[in-house]
């Protein structure tokens, strides 16, 4: 006797079919959310670059250029070169390190924090004063003979502070300059801002910062002509994205990419490496 199937809903297979379609669609939707729109690639966390404060302008431009060209996000952490190095050593977090002077990369390499470095540019110490140099400061000896006030980047946290102290200790002017220093700041940009606000008469800064501070006048002094810093970028051993970190480092060091930005912002490029 034939079985009567009249009591089994004919819509059940159809409902099961549509349920399967919905499940598949939701699965692919979740996968799509984990991918970068339009690229089919999984999103990666942004690269973290520890950058000396004096390099803020070119590096912000370079990070924006890189995002536009590759879609890779770059986060920039600014501070004094020594402060950044200490932070890297403690946290072991980040992808690239870009201090104001490559002597800090040498220290980082000695601490086994650096995998590879790429030379970029050079900068020279100058004296920042108010536009027009109203106090008529012409030499560092003026600080010994007149009650001018200084704001300095801390020699223990910032590259320019360390290099200026070493140079002026050698020529016997450090004590006079230290006595005229109202405050030591964590980074060179903090010292420049003190001059901009009229809190002090002068500050030691890098010549490359002129475009950041159009309201200030930068004076080249013979006592500072040899206070120069070589700028380079290092790939950190602690990076969890070595390939991406190397790619961005090469972008920064490329003549038509990052180096072009450095040159536009007043840096002198280092000679091409063989």
Q: Residues of each region from the PLM?
A:
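N-terminal intrinsically disordered, acidic low-complexity segments at the extreme N-terminus
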Residues: 1-3
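Exported/periplasmic ABC-transporter solute-binding proteins
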Residues: 5-77, 82-92, 99-111, 118-123, ...
């Amino acid at each position: 006797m034939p079985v009567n199937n009249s009591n089994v809903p004919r819509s059940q297979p159809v409902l099961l079919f549509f349920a399967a379609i919905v499940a598949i669609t939701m699965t692919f939707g979740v996968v799509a959310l984990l991918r970068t729109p339009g690229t089919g690639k999984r999103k990666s966390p942004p690269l973290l670059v520890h950058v000396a404060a004096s390099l803020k302008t070119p590096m912000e431009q370079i990070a924006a250029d890189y995002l536009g060209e590759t879609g890779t996000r770059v986060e920039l952490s600014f501070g004094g070169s020594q402060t950044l190095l200490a932070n890297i050593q403690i946290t072991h977090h980040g992808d690239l390190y870009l201090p104001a002077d490559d002597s800090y990369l040498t220290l980082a390499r000695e601490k086994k924090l650096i995998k590879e470095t790429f030379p970029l540019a050079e900068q020279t110490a100058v004296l920042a004063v108010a536009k027009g140099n109203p106090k008529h400061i012409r030499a560092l000896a003026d600080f010994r003979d007149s009650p001018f006030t200084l704001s300095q980047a801390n020699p223990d946290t910032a590259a320019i502070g360390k290099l200026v102290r070493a140079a002026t200790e050698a020529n016997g002017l450090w004590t006079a300059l230290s006595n005229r220093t109202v405050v030591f700041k964590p980074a060179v940009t903090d010292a420049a801002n003190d001059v901009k606000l009229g809190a002090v008469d002068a500050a030691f800064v890098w010549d490359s910062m002129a475009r950041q501070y159009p309201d200030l006048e930068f004076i080249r002094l013979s006592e500072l002509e040899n206070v120069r810093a070589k700028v380079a970028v290092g790939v950190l051993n602690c990076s969890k994205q070595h390939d991406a970190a190397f790619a961005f480092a090469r972008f920064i060091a490329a003549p038509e990419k990052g180096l072009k930005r450095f040159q536009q912002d007043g840096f002198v490029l280092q000679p091409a490496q063989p």
